[in-house]
Every structure is written in C-alpha cells, then in structure tokens.
Curated annotation (Swiss-Prot):
Role summary: Produces ATP from ADP in the presence of a proton gradient across the membrane. The catalytic sites are hosted primarily by the beta subunits.
Membrane-protein topology: Peripheral membrane protein
Lineage: Bacteria, Bacillati, Cyanobacteriota, Cyanophyceae, Synechococcales
Cross-referenced InterPro entries: AAA+_ATPase, ATP-synt_VA_C, ATP_synth_F1_bsu, ATPase_a/bsu_AS, ATPase_alpha/beta_chains, ATPase_F1/V1/A1_a/bsu_N, ATPase_F1/V1/A1_a/bsu_N_sf, ATPase_F1/V1/A1_a/bsu_nucl-bd
Complex formation: F-type ATPases have 2 components, CF(1) - the catalytic core - and CF(0) - the membrane proton channel. CF(1) has five subunits: alpha(3), beta(3), gamma(1), delta(1), epsilon(1). CF(0) has four main subunits: a(1), b(1), b'(1) and c(9-12).
Regions that span the bilayer: none
Protein name according to UniProt: ATP synthase subunit beta
Keyword tags: ATP synthesis, ATP-binding, CF(1), Hydrogen ion transport, Ion transport, Membrane, Nucleotide-binding, Thylakoid, Translocase, Transport
C-alpha cells in the first residue's frame, strides 16, 4: 500500500540490472526518485509470467540510475522491465482498523480476512519526535506483574530487552503485557515479527485468538495489530518490517493519544537483515562483518520509540545474542538504547515459578530512589539481598542440610523461599491452562506484601500459601484455607 503521491510520482524508469534482491533502475534525466521512495514494478516478463513487486530506493549511482532493494522475491524479473516511481516511501495502513489483523512489510493484509477497514496510511520513514515534544520526566510504567514492577520496573516510553531461551515463557509474558495494557491503561499493542520463524508467527496468532487478545468474532475489540516479515523473506522485507510496525504504533500514540506497547521479535534479525542489504549494496563491512552504518540503523529505529507529551510507545524487544557473546556488535549496540532488561531463567521455570523472571539478573535504570521513591527502592534491594544470600547458602544446604545453618541464616532461607514463591503470579492469558483466575497487582500492594515477608510478619504461614497468588491478602486467605484443610 503506498500513500497518495506528490507530483514526482508516476515517472517511469527501466530496469538495467538485477542481482538477487537488488535492482538498478535508469530514469530520465532530472527525474530521479528520492532515497527511500518506493518503486512499483508490475507487468509480464518476456516468458509471459506476471511480475508484481515493490522496491525501495537505497542509492543514487549517477548516470541517471538508482539502486533499489526489493521487498519480495525477484523471481521472473528481467532487464528492460518498467519500474514506476510512486513518489513516496512505502506506506502502511494505520488506525483502529489494523487491530486484530496481520500485515506484511508493505501493509498488505496476509490473514485472508478481506480488506482493511481503514483509509488512513502513513509512510514508514519519519523523523524521531523533536526534543521539545518529548516527556522528559521519567515515569514508571505499571505492568501489574509483581516481579517486574518491584525489581526491574519499565519506563513509560522506554525500551526493554527481553532475554530468554525457548520454552521459558517469553510468549506468555508478552501476551500478559498486551492484555494488561489494554485493560488497565486502555492502550493497544503492535507486534513486529522481524525475521523469526513463520510457524512461531502462526502459533502466536492462534494463541492470541485463544486468550482473547484478538477477538476473531469482532476484530474491533482486539487489542493488537501484527506485522510480520519472517525469515524466509528477502532481507529488504526483514529490514523494513520493524519500521512498518513502529509506524502503526506511532499513529496510536500521536493521533489517538494512547499509551502503546510495541513488541519486536527479534531485534537482532533487524540488524542481520541490514547487514545482508549492506553487503548487497557493495558497502565495505565493519567489525565482525556488520554494516558500517550499524549505529545509525539501530538509532533510527530506537529513537522513534519515545514518550511524548501526547502519549507513549513502550517497546519490549526480544534480543537474540549470537553464540551468547554479549560483546558482539549487534547486541552491544542494542544495549546502549535499553532502559531495562528482563531475563527469563530456565531454572526458575523448572521449579514452576512463573513468570520465570530472574530477580537477580534483571535490571532497570528506573530502580533509583529519585524515580521510584525510597520505600520502593529499599524494598527491592532488600528482596534482592535476601535472594542473593539464599543463592550463596544453597551449596551448604545441598551438602550439609538446613540444620547446619545458623538461626539467622535459617530465617533468611525461610523468607527467601517465601519471597521466591510470592514472585510467582497467575496470568489472565494462562487461565485456560492453569484454571486459576489471573491477577493484576498494584505496585503499592506489591511493595506492602514484600515488606511484610521481610519484616517476619508472615513467618508462621506455610510456604505453599505464597505460591501463584496476587497480593498479600490472598496469601493470608490461602494460609487459612490450608490450615482448615489440614485439621
């Protein structure tokens, strides 16, 4: 889908060279398209095959030629075919009509649900918000998830890195965040699937429908728009699909004045696609073979994710770390932009602690007294020091048993185990698996609950009472129920 075009639109050029997804197109003198303009190629090749694709101008070569990168396969494309300058960048549909739908990089619906119910479109290339428009006062974004709100709080309009292997609960955590922002903040979400498996994209769509995040019967009640450029697609599509998703999110922020969640899975694949395109365009590679423009490519995307005085885009980005090397230029460049990291731990998942967020490895720049307040800061640090001490004592416990510990250490272990259990929480989107109603816990309730555990006020309650509950009052009610059952 391409926006209404200016006067330069409609200029016709001729394809002079095709190398994989890269094409060189010759235009009449003085009629060259601008960088990032979309070129449309439609027609039949000499073999009689239908060809239809969009390409994006990347370089001006001289001799009235431009070099463009195709957004879909170039099979059947031949020299001499006609390319038309649309006069504008690739543009995607925006607004309420995008909710519940799946789009490709060009904003075309790919879910077989018919045309999109919106006439508004927006170009995927835009400047980041002006510094005068930004909300400069840091504000905590409450998620209703205890472990995140207490130990690694998200910044409204900030960027969060989500680290975790397969099967530790990334998708369920993403679904819960989408559900909570819709219910508590009245906001919507946009999901950008960048260079990941098609099967995962399909599974996510089906899970969204099951959990009610997408309402298949009435799409207008859906809470998320999906934008996919999967790993079987050309690098041009994978490089630009993140911008397509971001453009949809910007409309909800700037026009609807909403708080928006933007999920990008996976931000590394965005860099990887940029690296492939850079090599195809003949640029000299830099460190580890990445593109020389790595910093500006990542910055152009990340700087548009911001909180303005009108609304905010809070971005949660899954980060793949190649060969677990955090010094690799791709994750290292991404880290510079992140405000918080949420690390999912397989050991916690195997214990049945869900969400399996690691309370010691997850970090946030928001966790400082000037932002969250003294009480929140003190409680979070006390929880972390208690869990750290428990971690240090585990070797001794494994070898000698609990009885060999001092009275103080035994008390610490007892409270740490209760804290660990209390960090678990039933999710709304997991109700269909667990049979437990989901819980949204306010930040003040979370802080009060952990303070009571650490102060020893709940030492007499059984550990089981702290597992998979919402606030501390539910712990007390569950303890009474357990006591009644054991009589």
């Amino acid at each position: 889908m391409v926006a209404s075009a200016p006067a330069s639109a409609g200029t016709k050029g001729v394809i002079r060279q095709v190398i994989g997804p890269v094409l060189d197109v010759e235009f009449p003198a003085g009629k060259l398209p601008k960088i990032y303009n979309a070129l449309r190629i439609e027609g039949k090749n000499p073999a009689g095959d239908d060809v239809a694709l969009t390409a994006e101008v990347q370089q001006l070569l001289g001799d009235h030629r431009v070099r463009a990168v195709a957004m879909s396969g170039t099979d059947g494309l031949v020299r001499g075919m006609e390319a038309v300058d649309t006069g504008a960048p690739i543009s995607v549909p925006v607004g309420e009509g995008t909710l519940g739908r799946i789009f490709n990089v060009l904003g075309e619906p790919v879910d077989e649900q018919g045309p999109v119910n919106t006439t508004a479109t927006a170009p995927i290339h835009r400047d980041a918000p002006n510094i005068t428009e930004l909300e400069t006062k840091p504000k905590v974004f409450e998620t209703g998830i205890k472990v995140i709100d207490l130990l690694a709080p998200y910044r409204q309009g900030g960027k969060v890195g989500l680290f975790g292997g397969a099967g530790v609960g990334k998708t369920v955590l993403i679904q819960e965040l989408i559900n909570n922002i819709a219910k508590e903040h009245g906001g919507v979400s946009v999901f950008g699937g960048v260079g990941e498996r098609t099967r995962e994209g399909n599974d996510l769509y089906e899970e969204f429908k099951e959990s009610g995040v997408i309402n298949a019967d009435d799409l207008s009640k859906s809470k998320v728009a999906l934008c996919y450029g999967q790993m079987n697609e050309p690098p041009g599509a994978r490089m630009r699909v993140g911008l397509s998703a971001l453009t949809m999110a910007e409309h909800f922020r700037d026009v609807n004045k909403q708080d928006v969640l933007l999920f990008v899975d996976n931000i590394f694949r965005f860099v990887q696609a940029g690296s492939e395109v850079s090599a195809l365009l003949g640029r000299m590679p830099s460190a580890v073979g990445y593109q020389p423009t790595l910093g500006t490519d990542v910055g152009a995307l990340q700087e548009r994710v911001a909180s303005t005085v009108e609304g905010s885009i809070t971005s949660i980005q899954a980060v793949y770390v190649p060969a677990d090397d955090l010094t690799d230029p791709a994750p290292a460049t991404t880290f510079a932009h992140l405000d918080a990291t949420t690390v999912l731990n397989r050991a916690l998942a195997s214990k049945g602690i869900y969400p399996a967020v690691d309370p010691l490895d997850s970090t946030s720049t928001m966790l400082q007294p000037a932002v969250v307040g003294d009480e929140h800061y003190r409680t979070a640090r006390a929880v972390q020091s208690t869990l750290q001490r428990y971690k240090e004592l585990q070797d001794i416990i494994a070898i000698l048993g609990l009885d060999e510990l001092s009275e103080d250490d035994r008390r610490t272990v007892d409270r740490a185990r209760k804290v660990e259990k209390f960090l678990s929480q039933p999710f709304f989107v997991a109700e269909i698996f667990t049979g437990m109603p989901g819980k949204y816990v306010k930040l003040e309730e979370t802080i009060a609950g952990f303070n009571q555990i650490l102060a020893g006020e709940l030492d007499s309650l059984p550990e089981a009472a702290f597992y998979l509950v919402g606030n501390i009052e539910e712990v007390k009610a569950k303890a009474e129920k357990i006591a009644a059952e054991t009589k």
